[in-house]
């Protein structure tokens, strides 16, 4: 149940509260209604006062059905419609009241209010003038005179708005229309005119807001739905564009412009949905191809080019193609320097390329625009660890492989280097010591990078063979001497070592 106070507030916002009181206190007996109709009217009045609008409406429906010539039944039903925000339904009832009882000034005054809000200024003025000629109460007379002055002001502003629009002064036209629409809030034509001004001024989202209101205020407003759809499309919001153009076709399935636009939006939407599904499945190369098709399908709207390149940048980054990712992400960032998604994806590509300073810079820029993003925070911490790590021992550099190298590449590089730096190949004592140190590093790199768990730790900026990195200090239990590597077979894939190194 709605509280009576809230109903009073809603009623008062629609028309003068005094008129509601007139309605509620008006005695139905004056119409000579039968007992059943009188019962419905009285019960409906009580329900309305209690805020039970739907139940009150049912009672007044019954009263109208029971006595189609009862002006009080129509008037009270109009009151409920207005309280429910259904002004379109209230207007015919008020007109019926006036037809049945020409001197019912309360109904005529209420209708004048509605007509004024709809922007039907001539009709509203006619009602207010007739109220003044019908022996109104003091309050009704004041209200009618006030509304006549307001209507006259709206006429003047409308003329100024149309002149400004015609001369191409859209800023002035908007200023005039703003004032009119504070009063004529339900005028669909004026909202459509202001939407055109917003479009001319490069403010499409404000235009959409007015057009959405116009689509509700005017029945079968296919033109509004078409314009909303095209505006969303130009903004790059293909999903909302598709939704709005479908509303147009629901009203008129043969609407030529809506149907042509529908086919274009649907084609683009299908490509984008397919590309996103491929990304979710990890099929980044195929997704890239789809987004290239998006750019070819709609080359004239820059928004689709930017969004497509943003997603291609993401695909290259996730597919560990850092050179391509950096190139495309940079193209996006030239157009949108604050694009957080492109900054994150380029930062990840920089990490693969071991460009840690650049990665840190991108993460920090992204964090300025989205400080609560956990992915950015973790990425920045990782980049900082890797920068610090790069200043120490880098197992990837030791083996001469990229950070995204496969295990097979790592083993191949290890075997080649282990053979090259085998200490038995060196006779000079100094060279042998250098080779021993080099061989230890090579073996350590192979041990870390060929083990998924140890490699992940290293990729996250932690050296699994460095006790200080793992424990914050102390000795290094994993730092091995040359003697500990004797018997290590660089050409074995696992199991007991059969190959022995021999020293003089």
Curated annotation (Swiss-Prot):
Keywords from the UniProt entry: Antiviral defense, Chaperone, Deafness, Diabetes mellitus, Disulfide bond, Endoplasmic reticulum, Neurodegeneration, Neuropathy, Phosphoprotein, Repeat, Repressor, Signal, Stress response, TPR repeat, Translation regulation, Unfolded protein response
Spans annotated as Flexible linker: 375-393
Superkingdom of the organism of origin: Eukaryota
Phosphoserine found at: 274
Cell compartments where the protein resides: Endoplasmic reticulum
GO MF, one annotated term: protein kinase inhibitor activity
Limits of the J domain: 394-462
Disulfide cross-links: 248-258, 313-329
Tissue specificity field: Widely expressed with high level in the pancreas and testis. Also expressed in cell lines with different levels.
Cellular-component GO terms for this entry: azurophil granule lumen; cytoplasm; cytosol; endoplasmic reticulum; endoplasmic reticulum lumen; extracellular exosome; extracellular region; extracellular vesicle
UniProt repeat feature TPR, residue ranges: 37-70, 72-104, 105-138, 154-187, 189-221, 222-255, 268-301, 306-339, 340-373
Biological process, per Gene Ontology: cellular response to cold; defense response to virus; negative regulation of apoptotic process; negative regulation of endoplasmic reticulum stress-induced eIF2 alpha phosphorylation; negative regulation of translation in response to endoplasmic reticulum stress; positive regulation of translation initiation in response to endoplasmic reticulum stress; protein folding in endoplasmic reticulum; proteolysis involved in protein catabolic process
Pfam family, one: TPR_16
Chain positions covered by the region annotation Disordered: 451-481
Signal peptide: 1-31
Binding partners and assembly: Interacts with EIF2AK4/GCN2; this interaction occurs under endoplasmic reticulum (ER) stress, hypothermic and amino acid starving stress conditions and inhibits EIF2AK4/GCN2 kinase activity. Interacts with EIF2AK3. Interacts with EIF2AK2. Forms a trimeric complex with DNAJB1 and HSPA8. Interacts with THAP12.
Notes on the domains: The J domain mediates interaction with HSPA8.
Function recorded in the entry: Involved in the unfolded protein response (UPR) during endoplasmic reticulum (ER) stress. Acts as a negative regulator of the EIF2AK4/GCN2 kinase activity by preventing the phosphorylation of eIF-2-alpha at 'Ser-52' and hence attenuating general protein synthesis under ER stress, hypothermic and amino acid starving stress conditions. Co-chaperone of HSPA8/HSC70, it stimulates its ATPase activity. May inhibit both the autophosphorylation of EIF2AK2/PKR and the ability of EIF2AK2 to catalyze phosphorylation of the EIF2A. May inhibit EIF2AK3/PERK activity.
Disease annotated for this entry: Ataxia, combined cerebellar and peripheral, with hearing loss and diabetes mellitus: A disease characterized by juvenile-onset diabetes and neurodegeneration, resulting in ataxia, upper-motor-neuron damage, peripheral neuropathy, hearing loss, and cerebral atrophy.
This protein's name: DnaJ homolog subfamily C member 3
């Amino acid at each position: 149940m709605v509280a009576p106070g809230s109903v009073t507030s809603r009623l008062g916002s629609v028309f003068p509260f005094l008129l509601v009181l007139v309605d509620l206190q008006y005695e139905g007996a004056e119409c000579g209604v039968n007992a059943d109709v009188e019962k419905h009217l009285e019960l409906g009045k009580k329900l309305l006062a209690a805020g039970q609008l739907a139940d009150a409406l049912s009672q007044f429906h019954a009263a109208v059905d029971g006595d189609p010539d009862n002006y009080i039944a129509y008037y009270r039903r109009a009151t409920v419609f207005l309280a429910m925000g259904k002004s379109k339904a209230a207007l015919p009832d008020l007109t019926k009241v006036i037809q049945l009882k020409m001197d019912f000034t309360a109904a005529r005054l209420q209708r004048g209010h509605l007509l004024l809000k709809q922007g039907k200024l001539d009709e509203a003025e006619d009602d207010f003038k007739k109220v003044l000629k019908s022996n109104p109460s003091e309050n009704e007379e004041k209200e009618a005179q006030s509304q006549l002055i307001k209507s006259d002001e709206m006429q003047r502003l409308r003329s100024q708005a149309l002149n400004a629009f015609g001369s191409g002064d859209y800023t002035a036209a908007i200023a005039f229309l703003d004032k009119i629409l504070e009063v004529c809030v339900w005028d669909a034509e004026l909202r459509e005119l202001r939407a055109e001004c917003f479009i001319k001024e490069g403010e499409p989202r404000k235009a959409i807001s007015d057009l959405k209101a116009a689509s509700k205020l005017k029945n079968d407003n296919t033109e509004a739905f078409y314009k909303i759809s095209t505006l969303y499309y130009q903004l790059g919001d293909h999903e909302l564009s598709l939704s709005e153009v479908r509303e147009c076709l629901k009203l008129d399935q043969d609407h030529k412009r809506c149907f042509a636009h529908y086919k274009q939006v649907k084609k683009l939407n299908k490509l984008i949905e397919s590309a996103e599904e491929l990304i979710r499945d990890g099929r980044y190369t195929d997704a890239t191809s789809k987004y290239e098709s998006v750019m070819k399908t709609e080359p004239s709207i820059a928004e689709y080019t930017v969004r497509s390149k943003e997603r291609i940048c993401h695909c290259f980054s996730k597919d560990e193609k850092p050179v391509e990712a950096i190139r495309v992400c940079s193209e996006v960032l030239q157009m949108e320097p604050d694009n957080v998604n492109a900054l994150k994806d380029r930062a990840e590509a920089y990490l693969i390329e071991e460009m840690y300073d650049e990665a840190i810079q991108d993460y920090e820029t992204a964090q300025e625009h989205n400080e609560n993003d956990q992915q950015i925070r973790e990425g920045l911490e990782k980049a900082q660890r890797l920068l610090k790590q790069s200043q120490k021992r880098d197992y990837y550099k030791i083996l001469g492989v990229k950070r995204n190298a496969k295990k097979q590449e790592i083993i191949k590089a290890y075997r080649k280097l282990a053979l090259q730096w085998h200490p038995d190949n060196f006779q000079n004592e100094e060279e042998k010591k250098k080779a021993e140190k080099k061989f230890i590093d090579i073996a350590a790199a192979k041990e870390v990078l060929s083990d998924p768990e140890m490699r992940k730790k290293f990729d996250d900026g932690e050296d699994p063979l460095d006790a200080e990195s793992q424990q914050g200090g102390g000795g290094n239990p994993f730092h091995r001497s040359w003697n500990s590597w004797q018997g290590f077979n660089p050409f074995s894939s696992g199991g007991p070592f059969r190959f022995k190194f021999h020293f003089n």
